[in-house]
Amino acid sequence: MQKSEFRQSLLVTHFEDTKFEALEANNGAPRPQFLYRQLGVEQATGGAYDAHVIKGVPGSKPPIAEHKHTELDFLFVYVLKGWMSFHYHGHGEHRLKAGDCHIIPPGLSHTVTGWSEDVEILEITAPGHYKTIDTANGVEVAPATA
């Protein structure tokens, strides 16, 4: 492995300084069922990475349409609270509960099929912005984090 060429700045994010927010579609949230707490990682790494905590909008319902991410090298999810179910194309259905995690390889079609009312997940991506494609019609869902 070669040492990364990007520069990063010191980042300290305090819980009380951030809040969960819905992201506008043009800001890259194809999942209006969720709220995002941005941790500042994308800014601190010049876009090389992103990290955010995601929680469900009360009363929101699954499923999330099957999709895949392109121009994405790394997607990691760690369940902090509750549970979330995923269907991975060719790999079946998996329910992740608090303490479980997954890495989704670039281009693997998947969908979110369910979640608990109290779900919270940590999602880390590289790079911070990437494309999300609806696999049913091949249309780009959003140009950024998904």
Residue ranges and their predicted role:
Residues G90-G107:
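Short acidic-glycine-tyrosine-enriched beta hairpin
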Residues G107-L108, T113:
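Short, surface-exposed secondary-structure boundary micro-motifs
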Residues Y49-V53, C101-I103, S116-I133:
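A short hydrophobic beta-strand segment most commonly corresponding to one strand
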Residues A44-Y49, G59-F76, G90, K97:
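A short beta-loop-beta micro-motif enriched in histidine and acidic residues
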Residues H89-H91, G114-W115:
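Conserved catalytic-core motifs of eukaryotic protein kinase domains, centered on the activation segment
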Residues M1-P58, D134-A146:
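A short, N-terminal "cap"/entry segment at the start of jelly-roll beta-barrel domains
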Residues V53-V57, H69-F86, I124-P127:
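Short, conserved beta-strand element in jelly-roll/cupin
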